[in-house]
């Protein structure tokens, strides 16, 4: 399931993030890539110890916590600490690849399964040419280039790439989610059911039928969740 999270970051948060990035130091993105990804990856990233990166990551995590759409679509168990990357100049693209199934967390004592990938766009689309996030999965090929502050989530199993940036710079925040529900198909069913329940409540309130279906939703989640 591919889903757009419109205005995940507020205008004030976005302005703060862009101010933090004005004088940031960037590292070669290949330094954090695996064997396969190193062949395709040509971008830059903020260092792990970057103060700007830490502050932007904290803003993004806070925004995720208040996004009901993110919570119902991903059913998050854990979120990989967000990182910030940049495409432009000589470091302008990332070829076809699949994200690593498991990521080492910063403390090196734990790992996270990458069920869901997420990109939060930090640059307005009129500031750069190219740079589309191209995702190829069971829902068909998709080209994603969103307004600054918007985010996209999609299955971590997807083959995807970032097209070359031919003018300007494309900055974004990226991370992965380990879901309580491992199966993308089961997550989609739960999401569709939750959205239908929301509409039922709006139309009929807490009717006996709505209460019964809510119970079915939670029983399915109880059956499928890995806590």
UniProtKB/Swiss-Prot annotation:
Region (Disordered): 27-51
A Pfam family hit: PKHD_C
Domain Fe2OG dioxygenase: 78-179
Residues where 2-oxoglutarate binds: 170
Biased composition (Polar residues): 33-47
Cofactor note: Binds 1 Fe(2+) ion per subunit.
Enzyme Commission number: 1.14.11.-
GO molecular function: 2-oxoglutarate-dependent dioxygenase activity; iron ion binding; L-ascorbic acid binding
Cofactor(s) required for function per UniProt: Fe(2+); L-ascorbate
InterPro entries: Oxoglu/Fe-dep_dioxygenase_dom, PKHD_C, PKHD_hydroxylase, Pro_4_hyd_alph, Pro_4_hyd_alph_FE2OG_OXY
Key words of the record: Dioxygenase, Iron, Metal-binding, Oxidoreductase, Vitamin C
Binding, Fe cation: 97, 99, 160
Record GO biological process: DNA damage response; intracellular iron ion homeostasis
Top-level EC class: oxidoreductase
UniProt protein name: PKHD-type hydroxylase Veis_3084
């Amino acid at each position: 399931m591919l889903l757009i999270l419109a205005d995940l970051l507020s205008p004030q948060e976005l302005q703060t993030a862009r101010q933090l990035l004005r004088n940031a130091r960037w590292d070669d993105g290949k330094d954090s890539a695996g064997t396969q990804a190193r062949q395709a990856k040509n971008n830059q990233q903020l260092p792990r110890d970057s103060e700007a990166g830490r502050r932007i990551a904290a803003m993004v995590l806070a925004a995720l916590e208040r996004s009901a759409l993110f919570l119902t679509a991903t059913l998050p168990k854990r979120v990989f600490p967000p990182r910030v990357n940049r495409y432009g100049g000589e470091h302008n693209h990332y070829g076809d690849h699949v994200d690593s199934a498991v990521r080492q967390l910063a403390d090196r004592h734990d790992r996270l399964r990458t069920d869901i990938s997420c990109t939060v766009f930090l640059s307005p689309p009129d500031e750069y040419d190219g740079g589309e996030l191209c995702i190829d999965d069971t829902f068909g090929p998709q080209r994603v280039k969103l307004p600054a502050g918007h985010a996209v989530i999609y299955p971590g199993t997807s083959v995807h790439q970032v097209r070359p940036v031919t003018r300007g710079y494309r900055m974004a925040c990226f991370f992965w989610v380990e879901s309580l529900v491992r199966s993308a198909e089961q997550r989609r069913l739960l999401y569709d059911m939750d959205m239908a329940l929301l509409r039922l409540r709006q139309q009929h309130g807490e009717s006996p039928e709505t209460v019964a279906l809510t119970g079915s939703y939670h029983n399915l989640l109880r059956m499928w969740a890995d806590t």
